[in-house]
Amino acid sequence: QADINRIERKAFREHARIENAVAAYTRELCARLDEQQFTKGIQLTPIPEGGDSVLVVQLSDLHFNEQVNLPSNQYNFTIAAQRLRKLAQRVKQLGASYGARKVVVACLGDFLNSDRRLDELLSNCTNRSQASLLAADILRAFLLDLREQFEIEVYGITGNESRVNKELGWSDELATDSYDLMIYEILKRGFAGADGIAFCGFRANELLFEVMGRTFLCLHGHQI
């Protein structure tokens, strides 16, 4: 019995150390975000007036942290940032053409690449804690780029590859144990109080939002 108690206490201590470390990391991250707002020192343009059009931008399966180095294709954090920059410029062009004043950004999951299989782990650029911060920084720049011309609303759901645990869960409690939610909340907290950038909702598996009388359903591909 004494051996069993010792093993149980050891397991509890190890679990408690991990939980305390994660809690401390979260507190420190929140404190830093509160100190350094994403719009600090940036003069945001006035929210556009008039214009009836609204653009919907879908961000899905960005798979930040994946590294591809093939003759026919390359992908890493730098290329991902360049592609989002190009997308923002295209959105601005369309917005000017249609007289849009608002952009709704629908984040449909899998911001980060999986690391559950050996080939995925070997092809990733860094660990997923660091990758989540890099991803948030790239998405911050993307949203600020769009904010130069539009009012912004952001919605989000989880994907399947960005989940923290190996098992795929469907309940809200399990499905939101995801780097997708973490990145969304980092952005939400960093942009808190920013004029013209609103984070309007995040759900585990599906989400509905309305634009100009039309209802949009957000789903990730593994549910279709």
Residues covered by each model-derived region:
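Extended recognition/assembly regions associated with phosphoester-bond processing machinery
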Residues: 1-224
